[in-house]
């Protein structure tokens, strides 16, 4: 079995940083940059990466791409060279399908992504069991429904919603992006669990991407309803806006988010003191000692702290490498010819990942412990 700690410890971080940094420089800002060896050497396995590398959601896709690149370096061996090629989907389903087709033309044998839920649902519907797809952060049950070669690394919407409800014991305002599959899916699951648990949801507010520059109106209604906790399964950029708006209007409440909010402390221009006391359901913490080697390696290469999106994508590549080893496939074969064997291997492997101990069920959903953190003094503390 491939171990993260063994892999990270076997390499020179400085040498790895120089090698990866040099390649990234050659690729520049192009969305078609690749990592790895020559495809005709009999040792190269091609992994495509799809996510938003430009546009409003680019920060999530770029983080995932960086994590995947680092993993490709770490899990390549003398007999297995993991080659990566990234394509930009701008968090759009149609563009994600176009990106998938482009990667197929390149010779992709397995896919990491898409990063966002809507795009992942679109691509998984096109795969027809002809490609191993491991998405780092798409959480809807629709991603893997009726698919045999599609897998998730992040928690599913019901898991996140139900787990979050266990931590909520106040007057709650539910706040989510009604135009986003991830956000609305987790919100629905939370509301269902809240009803079963007899939690007190006093207000429900929504927004869409084109109205995410101010949430004063929604917060005013939540405050008037007496909400002391806002459960918001949203990404970290709108979360930073919400917290600033709340401070400006003097609304003292607790914000609770899910894994998409990880990265809040790194939002450019954000006053991180506003995040004090924020409760997060996320499988990864850069402050956790067990992730120290990965965090150091990531910082050495990218000069920034990794977030959950980077860690999830790293675990995707780790899982694919483990599945290749388990399946004992011909790594020069077409993706369609080996997808079934890789999928069978995915359901048998167990990896000690950055985001927990990961296994997968028959539906392709990840099974790992749900964890919660509270932000205190700019660090993640176990809740």
Language-model features: where?
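N-terminal secretory signal peptides
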Residues: 1-8, 16-27
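Extracellular/periplasmic periplasmic-binding protein-like sensory domains
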Residues: 243-314
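An alpha-beta-alpha
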Residues: 53, 149-206, 229
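Beta-alpha junction/loop-to-helix N-cap segments that form part of ligand/metal-binding clefts
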Residues: 38, 60-66, 74-144, 153, ...
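Bacterial lipoprotein signal-peptidase II cleavage site
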Residues: 27-40
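Segments of small-molecule ligand-sensing domains
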Residues: 306-310, 321-379
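Extracytoplasmic "Venus flytrap"
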Residues: 48-67, 87-94, 116, 177-184, ...
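Hydrophobic alpha-helical segments within soluble ligand-binding/sensing domains
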Residues: 96, 152-171, 184-186, 212-216, ...
């Amino acid at each position: 079995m491939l171990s993260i700690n063994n892999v990270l410890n076997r390499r020179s971080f400085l040498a790895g940083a120089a090698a990866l940094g040099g390649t990234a420089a050659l690729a520049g800002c192009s969305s078609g940059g690749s990592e790895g060896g020559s495809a005709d050497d009999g040792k190269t396995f091609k992994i495509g990466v799809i996510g938003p590398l430009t546009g409003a959601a680019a920060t999530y896709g770029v983080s995932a791409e960086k994590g995947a690149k680092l993993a490709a370096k770490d899990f390549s061996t003398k007999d297995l060279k993991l080659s990566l090629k990234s394509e930009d989907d701008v968090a759009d389903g149609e563009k994600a399908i176009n990106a998938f087709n482009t990667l197929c033309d390149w010779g992709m044998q397995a896919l990491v992504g898409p990063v966002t839920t809507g795009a992942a649902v679109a691509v998984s519907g096109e795969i027809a069991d002809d490609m191993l797809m491991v998405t780092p952060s798409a959480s809807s049950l629709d991603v893997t429904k009726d698919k045999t070669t599609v897998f998730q690394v992040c928690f599913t919407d019901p898991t996140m919603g139900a787990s979050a409800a266990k931590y909520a014991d106040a007057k709650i305002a539910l706040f989510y992006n009604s135009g986003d599959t991830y956000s609305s899916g987790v919100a629905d699951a939370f509301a269902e669990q809240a009803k079963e648990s007899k939690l007190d949801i006093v207000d429900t507010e929504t927004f869409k991407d084109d109205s995410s520059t101010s949430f004063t109106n929604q917060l005013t209604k939540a405050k008037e309803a007496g909400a002391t906790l806002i459960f918001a399964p949203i990404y970290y950029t709108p979360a930073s806006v919400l917290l600033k708006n709340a401070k400006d209007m003097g609304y003292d409440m607790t914000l609770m988010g899910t894994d998409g909010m990880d990265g809040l402390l790194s939002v450019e221009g954000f006053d991180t003191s506003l995040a004090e006391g924020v409760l997060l359901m996320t499988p990864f913490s850069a402050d956790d000692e067990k992730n120290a080697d990965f965090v150091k390696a990531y910082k050495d290469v990218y000069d920034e702290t990794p977030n959950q999106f980077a860690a999830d994508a790293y675990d995707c590549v780790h899982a694919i490498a483990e599945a290749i080893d388990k399946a004992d496939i011909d790594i020069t074969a077409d993706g369609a010819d080996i997808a079934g064997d890789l999928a069978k291997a995915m359901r048998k492997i167990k990896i000690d990942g950055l985001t927990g101990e990961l296994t997968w069920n028959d539906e392709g959903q990840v099974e790992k412990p749900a964890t919660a953190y509270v932000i205190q003094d700019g660090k993640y503390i176990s809740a």
